[in-house]
UniProtKB/Swiss-Prot annotation:
GO MF annotations in UniProt: 4 iron, 4 sulfur cluster binding; metal ion binding; quinolinate synthetase A activity
One of the record's GO cellular component terms: cytosol
Protein name per UniProt: Quinolinate synthase
An annotated GO BP: 'de novo' NAD biosynthetic process from L-aspartate
Domain of life: Bacteria
Natural source organism: Xylella fastidiosa (strain Temecula1 / ATCC 700964)
Residues involved in iminosuccinate binding: 63, 81, 152-154, 169, 237-239, 254
Cofactor(s) of this protein: [4Fe-4S] cluster
The enzyme's E.C. designation: 2.5.1.72
Keywords noted in UniProt: 4Fe-4S, Cytoplasm, Iron, Iron-sulfur, Metal-binding, Pyridine nucleotide biosynthesis, Transferase
Family designation: Belongs to the quinolinate synthase family. Type 2 subfamily.
Length: 339
């Protein structure tokens, strides 16, 4: 999914709070609209962010897992990791605010070294990115000499720098096959590697990293969903365990899931991924019933309207990449984008 928003300075609450298909999201919001003061702060944050973007010539890139008030309310560009990486190259702005997790902000910086890149919360990490280090990659090279290393973008810049090429969940199979070799290492997501291996003749050696959101889904969850919601279409992310992917009706990146709903228009659908994904695309599909069966990413949820506003007001927190690793990391990302 890749989409640009040019929002007028209106009350975004009218879009977010009053839209029936986002009621589940507002319910999850807890007490954030429990008082008039909270409502006023919400509107003030929205208005301030628009004014700060104008003053600083800033754009906000938001991942599909961001909450609807960010995704629909203040983001200029939204999408999955691949879409954000591609769009980051063409951003015409002095400042980029990355509403996502740290590896995404690093990727934006790699592709825009001359621009200021901010992440609203420096602690917005990723279990996959934390599952592997550059030292681990070096040991893998020693153990498998001559085997190309395909690295998921959900990694640090330092790990990317130690790799040959990057991939996303949306292009992993394409990247693996484009290398024209019989065997590759795919790191760090074990389940993504195993799921891709089922779709290609290329032999894939995997690492043991897992996404803490997607590893929680099980094939028994799908059986229960089908029993409770007859006729439901089940879409799974390829970071899910292979038995989950096998039991689903379709598996793909968040962009592919969105495209599936748009083109197939299932009457009833469940997305086995992060909760905000369903909330964000439901607004465009009022005739589709979205069944709730999701897991929250605590890292993505560290990004809020309030800390986006603070990031723009105080230039917090600027993302930098060490010069020694920036060039090789950038090459790994650019090789992916060239495919």
């Amino acid at each position: 999914m890749e989409e640009a928003h040019n929002m007028r300075e209106i009350s975004i609450r009218e879009i977010v709070v009053n839209h029936a298909v986002l009621s589940s999201c507002i319910d999850k919001c807890g007490d954030c609209f429990a008082s008039e003061a909270a409502r006023i702060k919400f509107d003030n944050d929205i208005e301030a962010i628009f004014e700060l973007k104008r003053k600083r010539n800033a754009v906000i890139l938001a991942h599909n897992y961001q909450t609807p008030e960010i995704f629909h309310g203040v983001a200029d560009i939204v999408g999955d990791s691949l879409a954000l990486a591609r769009k980051a190259i063409d951003v015409d702005a002095d400042v980029i605010v990355l509403a996502g997790v740290h590896f995404m902000a690093e990727t934006a910086k790699l592709l825009n070294p001359e621009k200021t890149v901010l992440i609203p919360d420096r602690e917005a990490g990723c279990s996959l990115a934390e599952s592997i280090t550059p030292e681990d990659v070096a040991l893998l090279r020693q153990a498998h000499p001559g085997i190309p290393i395909v690295t998921y973008v959900n990694t640090s810049a330092a790990v990317k720098a130690a790799s040959d090429i990057c991939c996303t969940s949306g292009n992993a199979k394409k990247v693996v096959e484009a290398l024209g070799v019989p065997k590759v290492l795919m790191i760090p997501d074990e389940y993504l590697a195993r799921n891709v291996a089922k779709e290609t003749e290329v032999q894939i050696i995997s690492w043991h990293g897992h996404c803490e959101v997607h590893e929680l889904f099980s094939a028994s969850d799908i059986l229960q969903l089908r029993e409770n919601h007859p006729g439901v279409t089940v879409l799974a992310h390829p970071e899910c365990p292979p038995d989950v992917v096998a039991a689903a009706d379709f598996a793909g990146s968040t962009a592919a899931m969105s495209d599936y709903v748009t083109t197939k228009q299932p009457k009833r659908v469940v997305l086995l991924t992060e909760c905000s994904m369903s909330d964000n695309i439901a607004v465009h599909h009022p005739d589709v019933e979205f069944i709730s069966s999701c897991n929250l990413c605590p890292h993505m949820k560290r990004i809020t309207l309030a800390n986006i506003r603070t990031a723009l007001e105080e230039n917090r927190h600027e993302v930098t990449v060490d010069a020694k690793i920036a060039d090789p990391a950038r090459r790994a990302v650019e090789r992916m984008l060239a495919i």
